[in-house]
Amino acid sequence: MALRPAAGAALGLLLGLLALPAAAAPACPPVKPQVRVSISDPEPRLSTAFGIDALHAKSGRPRSANVHHLALTSSRVEWEGEIDARTATGRGGVCARPERVMLTLTQTEHLIRIAREIPRGSCLFREVEAHERRHVAVNRRTLRAAAARAREAATAWAATAEGRGVTEREAVAALQRGLRHAIERTVGAMRAQRDAAHRGIDTEAEYRRLSRVCSADQRALREKLRAVSAD
């Protein structure tokens, strides 16, 4: 019998603990998000530092005795995002919302490589460069299209985005992850669009056309390559 009051007291304590209210999640601050997108697209560089063999290796395409890789245009797009956030703190932690979102899309590498075996200023050099400039146009056009889509994606994301965490740093980091997820999908779509446009340029018909232009330069190039392979 002496144990019953103790058991009752313990039960009462347990019930009291269970009745404590949970820490409420903090209300998120009101914001009117602003999104700014900028582009960095410097003029592509033109290089003749690589020979035909090196361009073959960089292209990743199989070698062929009848097909020579005369040029290669490369481009890499990177993006950076900054968020100015407003935060609210409560017993349940911190809620962060984006007040300003700044995005920058940059063409960090844009390089036209033309085989050094082709003399600068020659008919063949001009034809090959004109072909590569079409690839440059694709890269620049798709970068601008990606910037427009990134603005739309960031605006839609910012309208409802919330980041929560125990600390302000955790809450802002959650916002950054959400922005990265939204923009990476846009950049991925740009890469797919860009690849398709490049394939539309590098057609069999275009390669046949290039093989017939500047006949004197083509003969001189073939003789040069035969002389090199004979050594």
Question: Which positions does each model-derived feature cover?
Answer:
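Internal, charge-rich low-complexity segments
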Residues: A145-G163
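N-terminal secretory signal peptides that target proteins for export/translocation
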Residues: M1-R4
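Sequence context surrounding c-type heme c attachment/ligation sites in exported
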Residues: L105-T106, L111-P119, R144
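Short alpha-helix carrying the canonical HExxH Zn2+-binding catalytic motif
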Residues: G121-R134
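Boundary at the C-terminal end of the N-terminal hydrophobic targeting segment
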Residues: A22-A27
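Catalytic Zn2+-binding segment of zinc metalloproteases
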Residues: R133-A150
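Metalloprotease/metallohydrolase-associated module, dominated by Zn2+-dependent proteases
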Residues: P29, P33-T104, I114-A115, W157-D231
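Bacterial N-terminal signal peptides
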Residues: G8-P21
